[in-house]
Structures are given as structure tokens and as C-alpha cells.
């Protein structure tokens, strides 16, 4: 069951210490850096808010780091939430195994289970953006007692697994005829599978330019148009024959200069091989989804936040949201006038959407 909600808007001690990375107001608890290690993995995470406050864990996607959530952390920490934002596996200060199979969703969910135990294992609100959404959804499906509610941003929930074979059947074939665009807007996903080394090399040719070129605000003029992501194979890569991103200034409305520098520093360390390996595990991710209790049905309250101008993941002009609507017993949907990078494009509006849903859901 789904309902449209809220309308459209314009822990524990850790080895890493408490390095202050900033706060926007005097009444906001300092955002601090921590590191947690288990025998199998190390997770670097940011935290803010009272240690005994209700727990909110925010999971970033590709190609992001935990710092992407700064605005949301500061807002909810100032309201008494204990907010935690890890660098996910392969990113930033967290472990980056060499094997591609180490980035299967079951491994990443295991990371979050260990982190959750380290934080005290109180049932949490799990918030995910982009690839963080499949992680949050899978954790709720496989470990329901750990989740009070789930917020999925940009990428909807797929009970059978967020994998290319499950995405292609949902493509809008009026916009993407199968004979011209067999993988539709997901062509970039296919290209990562078929041209992995080239993709990594192209992204790493100029890290600041790559990140600046990826982080652009959504454009309402793109609605109903073929997405550039559908042309990656035809163009021989995201950047074509240049094999590197064009010189592009970062958008200060998305990342402050200080935070963009931190993002670049993180990718100078990790590169793109580990973060792109998340795309290489369709078979394992589908198999993992099949092991979820009750077919992956979610009984917790779920909020999905859709970007009206998201050329890849918008659920209003395609069938992309159908599996989520069928699988979530208590689903709320809100739409924001933005593209894919909702936590950055609509910082305050996203906070308000989550806040309203928390209140309405009694969370």
C-alpha cells in the first residue's frame, strides 16, 4: 500500500577519536570522525547529536562519502537525534578490498550490521541515497528488528534485488525503444560491466573534474528527453574519445568548497575501482534478495523521496516504482523539484520531508 505524502516542495566510543569537521550553528553538536574495526572490515563514520538520542543512520551512494549528509546530520542532530553517516565499503576511510565480489550487497549489509552492533543495536531509522537505498532496503528486509523505519532517496526499493536484469523490464519503452536503447537509461550500468577498466581509468584521469562533472543540479528541461546515461556505449564511454572529464568547476550550491575538497581527497585515496565494483555483483545480489524473509516484503514505515527531474530513477514516468509499491505495506512517497542528488540539491526540503514523515509515522 502506498500513499503520497507531504506534497512537492520547491555512539559508542571509537578508535578514531573526535576530530571536529564542522557545524553550522552553535547549537549543533560537533560533527566528529570515528573508526570502527571488526575482524572483517573497518568503517569510518561521522557522528553528531546526543549519544542517547534516537538513532538515525545515513547511507550514501555512488560516488559519495558520509560527509554528503552534512546538512541532514546537522538538522537532525540539533533536534536530538544521534546521527551516524559511514563511509561505505570502498569509500573514504573505510576498507576497500581488492576482490570485486567483496562489494556484493550481502557483504555491505554485514558491514552495517556490525556497525549497528557497535553503536548499541538500538532499532534505527535507516536513510539511504542512490546505492545507499538498496543497502537500507536490504537491511530492513533481512534484519527487520534493526529498523524502525526506512527512508529511500532517489533509488526505489527492489525486493528482488537492485540489479540490471530487474531494471531493464521497467524501462519506459516509449522514450527508449528497445531496438535503439536496449538498456534504456541504465546503459551506463551495462557499460560499467562490459568496460570496467576503461571506466575506472576515465574517471581517475582527473578526479576533481570527474566529480564536478557528475555533481550537477537537475534540469526540468530534461524531463521527457533521452538521458545522457543512455548513450554511454554509443559514445564509447561517459567522456567519449577524450577519456577524461572536461574541466568543470564544482557547483558551490551542492558542495561547499571545503567539503568538495574533502570529497576529492577521499577519491584521490580510494580511486574509482572499488566504488564501481558495487555494480559488478548482479548475480550475487539477486541470490541474496531471494533469501530475505517473506519475499523481501517490508512492514516498517517506508518513505521514498523522488526527484521530479531525475533522468534515471524518477518513478512517476516509468514503472520503476512498481516493485516498491507492491513490497511495502506502509509506503509514503514525496516528490521534490530536483534531479538525482537530492540530499545536496534540496537540503532543507529533504529534511522537512523526512521530519514530516517521522511525525506522521509516529517515529
Annotate each language-model stretch with its function:
Residues 328-363:
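Catalytic active-site module of serine/aspartate enzymes centered on a nucleophile-bearing elbow/loop
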Residues 39-47:
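A short loop-to-beta-strand scaffold at the N-terminal edge of the catalytic core in hydrolase folds
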Residues 70, 137-141, 351:
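Short, hydrophobic alpha-helix immediately C-terminal to the catalytic nucleophile
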Amino acid at each position: 500500500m502506498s500513499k503520497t505524502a507531504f506534497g512537492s516542495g520547491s555512539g559508542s566510543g571509537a578508535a578514531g577519536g573526535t576530530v571536529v569537521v564542522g557545524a553550522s550553528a552553535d547549537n549543533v553538536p560537533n560533527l566528529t570522525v570515528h573508526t570502527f574495526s571488526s575482524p572483517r572490515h573497518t568503517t569510518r563514520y561521522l557522528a553528531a547529536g546526543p549519544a542517547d538520542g534516537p538513532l538515525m543512520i545515513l547511507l550514501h551512494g555512488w560516488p559519495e562519502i558520509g560527509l554528503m549528509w552534512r546538512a541532514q546530520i546537522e538538522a537532525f542532530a540539533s533536534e536530538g537525534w544521534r546521527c551516524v553517516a559511514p563511509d561505505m565499503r570502498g569509500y573514504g576511510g573505510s576498507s576497500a578490498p581488492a576482490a570485486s565480489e567483496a562489494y556484493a550487497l550481502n557483504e555491505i549489509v554485514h558491514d552495517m550490521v556490525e556497525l549497528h552492533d557497535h553503536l548499541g543495536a538500538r532499532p534505527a531509522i535507516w536513510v539511504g541515497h542512490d546505492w545507499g537505498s538498496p543497502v537500507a532496503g536490504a537491511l530492513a528486509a533481512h534484519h527487520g528488528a534493526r529498523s524502525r523505519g526506512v527512508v529511500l532517496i532517489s533509488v526505489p526499493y527492489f525486493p528482488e534485488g537492485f540489479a540490471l536484469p530487474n531494471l531493464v523490464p521497467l524501462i519506459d519503452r516509449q522514450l527508449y525503444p528497445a531496438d535503439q536503447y536496449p538498456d534504456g537509461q541504465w546503459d551506463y550500468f551495462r557499460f560499467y560491466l562490459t568496460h570496467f577498466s576503461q571506466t575506472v581509468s576515465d574517471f581517475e584521469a582527473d578526479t576533481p573534474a570527474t566529480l564536478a562533472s557528475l555533481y550537477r543540479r537537475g534540469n526540468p528541461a530534461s524531463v521527457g528527453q533521452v538521458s545522457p546515461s543512455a548513450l554511454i556505449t554509443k559514445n564509447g564511454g561517459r567522456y567519449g574519445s577524450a577519456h577524461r572529464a572536461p574541466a568543470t568547476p564544482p557547483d558551490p550550491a551542492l558542495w561547499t568548497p571545503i567539503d568538495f575538497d574533502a570529497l576529492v581527497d577521499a577519491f584521490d585515496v580510494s580511486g574509482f575501482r572499488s566504488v564501481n565494483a558495487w555494480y559488478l555483483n548482479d548475480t550475487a545480489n539477486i541470490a541474496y534478495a531471494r533469501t530475505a524473509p517473506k519475499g523481501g516484503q517490508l512492514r516498517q514505515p517506508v518513505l521514498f523521496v523522488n526527484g521530479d527531474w531525475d533522468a534515471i530513477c524518477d518513478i512517476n514516468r516509468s514503472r520503476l516504482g512498481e516493485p516498491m509499491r507492491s513490497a511495502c505495506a506502509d509506503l509514503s512517497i514525496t516528490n521534490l523539484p530536483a534531479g538525482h542528488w537530492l540530499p545536496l540539491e534540496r537540503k532543507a526540503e529533504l529534511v522537512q520531508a523526512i521530519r514530516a514523515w517521522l511525525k506522521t509515522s509516529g517515529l
